[in-house]
Amino acid sequence: MDDPELEKIKQKKLADMIAQQQESIAQSQIQVIDLNSMNFDSITSQGLVLVDFWAEWCGPCKLMHPVFERMAKKYRHIKFARVNVDQNQDISMKFGVQAIPTFIMFKDGKQVDRMMGAVGEPGIHMIAKKYQM
């Protein structure tokens, strides 16, 4: 027995399941980029990049890591990246990073915004929303 309405519902359900699976795959592929003196300029020179300046020994920095990763999945129009200040002192000195965590937004290679401290999800949300396309 062929019911066209039932077939239509099945096709819609299948399309929804495929779309959901593709979204899940896309979400899992989004990651925070580790920056160093070799890749910093090439990564920050194109589009929007929010950079987290952090250190291994910094408790507030470590608290921000999962928040930063969640926000990277939410705001896909922005690249999210990290600079370990102990391993990349030249980069942190270049941008005058004196407190950590410090978050700097770059647009096409130019610094356009900055926040300091463990700002949590509201802080990252605020800066990301400000540069939403």
Language-model-derived ranges and their functions:
Residues 1-50, 56, 66-74, 78, ...:
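Proteins that catalyze or organize thiol-disulfide redox chemistry
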Residues 51, 81-84:
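Rossmann-like NAD(H)/NADP(H) cofactor-binding core
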Residues 58-61:
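Short cysteine clusters
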